[in-house]
């Protein structure tokens, strides 16, 4: 009589799919010091997830980054317009003050 073993094997694709679906957070601190004097501290925070999972947890910085998205370039135009409007408002306020 043969004994059957139920062995599960995962391929790299299966592992990556699970990681991207659920997300993985890696955090660590590296400190270099001599004689109780801290010389260097490196704080590492890494998240590995799919784009959908990242958006789900509120990480969508790449959507508004002008170097990564066309939406981000629009923010630059809005900033310029806002600056121009502030300058116009300041000029108008100064004109009102001088007429008083």
UniProtKB/Swiss-Prot annotation:
The minimal pNL29 gvp locus overexpressed in E.coli can be filled with Xe and used as a contrast agent for ultrasound and magnetic resonance imaging. Engineered gas vesicles (GV) can be used for noninvasive imaging in E.coli and mice. Heterologous GVs with 2 copies of gvpA plus gvpC from D.flosaquae and the gvpR-gvpU operon from this bacterium make GVs suitable for imaging of bacteria deep in mouse tissues (e.g. the gastrointestinal tract), or when expressed in tumor-homing bacteria, can be detected in tumors. It comes from the Bacteria. The gene is gvpJ. Interacts with GvpA. InterPro entries: Gas-vesicle_GvpA-like, GvpA, GvpA-like_CS. This is Gas vesicle protein J. Belongs to the gas vesicle GvpA family. A minor component of the gas vesicle, might be involved in nucleating gas vesicle formation. This protein could be important for the shape determination of the gas vesicle. Gas vesicles (GV) are hollow, gas filled proteinaceous nanostructures. During planktonic growth they allow positioning of the organism at a favorable depth for light or nutrient acquisition. When a minimal gvp locus (gvpA2-gvpR-gvpN-gvpF-gvpG-gvpL-gvpS-gvpK-gvpJ-gvpT-gvpU, called pNL29) is expressed in E.coli gas vesicles are made. PROSITE patterns: GAS_VESICLE_A_1 (PS00234), GAS_VESICLE_A_2 (PS00669).
């Amino acid at each position: 009589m043969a004994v059957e073993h139920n062995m599960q094997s995962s391929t790299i694709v299966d592992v990556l799919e699970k990681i991207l679906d659920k997300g993985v957070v890696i955090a660590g601190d590296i400190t270099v010091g001599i004689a109780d004097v801290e010389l260097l501290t490196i704080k590492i925070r890494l998240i590995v997830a799919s784009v959908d999972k990242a958006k789900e947890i509120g990480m969508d910085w790449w959507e508004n980054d002008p170097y990564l998205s066309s939406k981000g370039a629009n923010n630059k135009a809005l900033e310029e317009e806002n600056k121009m409007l502030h300058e116009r408002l300041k000029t108008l306020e100064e004109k009102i003050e001088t007429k008083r």
